[in-house]
A protein has these predicted regions:
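Bacterial Sec-dependent N-terminal signal peptides
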Residues: 1-24
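Hydrophobic pocket/interface hotspot
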Residues: 40, 52-53, 60, 77, ...
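Short, low-complexity N-terminal intrinsically disordered segments enriched in polar/charged residues
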Residues: 18-54, 58, 78
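Short beta-strand edge/turn micro-motifs at domain boundaries
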Residues: 128-154
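A short hydrophobic beta-strand element
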Residues: 106-115
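Short, surface-exposed coil-to-beta transition loops
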Residues: 96-97, 125-131
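Short, cysteine-centered beta-strand-loop-beta hairpins and adjacent loop/turn segments enriched
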Residues: 91, 117-126
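A solvent-exposed, acidic/Ser-Thr-rich amphipathic alpha-helical stretch
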Residues: 54-100
Length: 156
């Protein structure tokens, strides 16, 4: 009897292990999560452009909150987006996003935040804003940024 029980347990365990190794990712593994958005925000606060880009698709799009067209300045592809983010950190060496809150609906997500930073001329900025995200296969395909239009606070 022990041999029969052992035999069936071995089959069940082997079957379970084999199923795990060949089962494709579940749908939820490719969906946006609060953890992904938190990590993305943390990478921004660390000024870690490589880490930021690791959360984005190769053909990602960043629509900046300001620019010459109706949807701000648009950066397409990782190289262009990388340069745009590097410029933000160059122009605001102490850039920081706080009071971050996230919301998710399907493949879309929103992050609200307060941005603070000091420009190279010493003037300061503090504004609220949000990012609208479109995800594809668990990564950010579009980051569309909006923020309040408030003049910089002059250097004191």
């Amino acid at each position: 009897m022990k041999k029969i029980i052992f035999f069936f347990l071995t089959i069940l365990i082997t079957d379970k292990l084999m199923a795990q190794s060949i089962t494709p990712k579940t749908a939820t593994e490719n969906k946006p999560t609060i953890a992904i958005l938190d990590s993305f925000a943390n990478a921004f606060n660390a000024h870690d452009v490589g880490k930021i880009l690791s959360y984005m698709t190769d053909d990602c799009v960043f629509e900046a909150s300001a620019g010459p067209s109706v949807d701000g300045e648009k950066f397409i592809g990782k190289e262009a987006v990388k340069k745009a983010f590097e410029d933000v950190f160059k122009n605001y060496p102490n850039a920081h996003w706080s009071n971050v809150r996230h919301f998710i609906s399907g493949e879309r997500a929103v992050s609200e935040w307060t941005f603070t930073g000091t420009k190279l001329d010493g003037s300061k900025i503090e504004v609220t804003g949000c990012d609208l995200f479109t995800f594809r296969d668990g990564k950010i395909a579009i980051k569309n940024s909006y923020r309040k239009n408030r003049p910089p606070i002059p250097k004191s």
